[in-house]
Amino acid sequence: MKTVLIAGAGQLGSRHLQGVKTSKHELDIWVYDLSEDSLAVAEERYNQVESDNKTAHFVNSLDLVPAELDVVIVASSSKPRYTIVSQLLSTHSVKYLVLEKFLFPKLSDYSEIDELLKKKGVMTWVNCPRRMWEGYEYIKSLIVPELPVEYTFEGGEWGMCCNTIHFVDIFMALNGAASFEFCIDDLEQEVVDSKRPGYVEIHGTERFTTANGSVLRLTSTTAFDGVSRSIIKNGNNIIEYFEGKGEIVVNGELKNVPVHYQSGLSGILIDELLEKGSCRLANYEQSASYHVAYLSKIAPFINTIKGWTSESCPIT
């Protein structure tokens, strides 16, 4: 029996838990959170999924978790993630680690965690799951690698700070470049409170460019009243992806694809890790480089507007 830990039993963590329960493997599942209320919700959601080869434990201390763990998913918000990972790896042996985004709100955390992961020999990935979506795998098959990718997404209150890294990740997966330049000239000079207490959000347009000529444009505006969709141009192809409806339109021709939720992906992720020793997500080194490039510009932008002097930036 393999042992899995989910650290963080909030909304996302409980969906990870439901997904993990669908794994084909016999699993001993541990769920850790300081909040008894979150643990109760997670247990309720766990019981909504049927499986006859899983056991589950809900605990409020890492001291109660087995010392040797096959897979760990850290699904907390960004602020406590550094502490959770540091504490966990100082007391437990972890084979495979999956971290939720936004990884960390403080730039120095990235190199420190990188050193710790290398020291402990922990294989680590970051959960930007669009790489696992059937729709994006189909789009990837249409991409001509020698030609640039132009990716545009516009929407209303879609949580730009929180979710930009998802789009950056799949954009980089599609265009094949190693790094990007990030332009914030068209962001609105206002910082608003996030839906999640203690975090912030922004509006406007972000622009990312790569050395191979690819461009990603992301726009979030309170005035938007259209249908959100991704528009991807490459060579002769114009691709529209309506993620929420599971519809992809390629040069006017419709293709239906599944709509993916985390509860439908985490079991697949566990199976890939246990059976292959790898998965389709970006590894820590890749994703951390995207995070650092983004945070290096967005943190000073936000902190200047807010009048903060901290080197940290509350995005999650």
PLM regions: where:
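Short acidic low-complexity segments
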Residues: D52-E68
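C-terminal helix-rich "cap/oligomerization" subdomain common to oxidoreductases
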Residues: E26, V71-S76, E272-T316
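NAD(P)-dinucleotide binding in Rossmann-like oxidoreductases
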Residues: R196-E201, F208-L273, S278-E285
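Rossmann-like NAD(P)H-binding beta-loop-alpha module
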Residues: E134-E150
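Beta-strand-loop-alpha-helix segment that lines the small-molecule cofactor/substrate pocket
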Residues: V71-V74, S78, Y82-R131
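N-terminal Rossmann-like dinucleotide-binding module
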Residues: M1-S51
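A short helix-to-beta-strand connector/capping loop
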Residues: Q48-H57, K119-V122
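Rossmann-like dinucleotide-binding domain that binds NAD(P)(H)
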Residues: Y151-D225, E285-S289
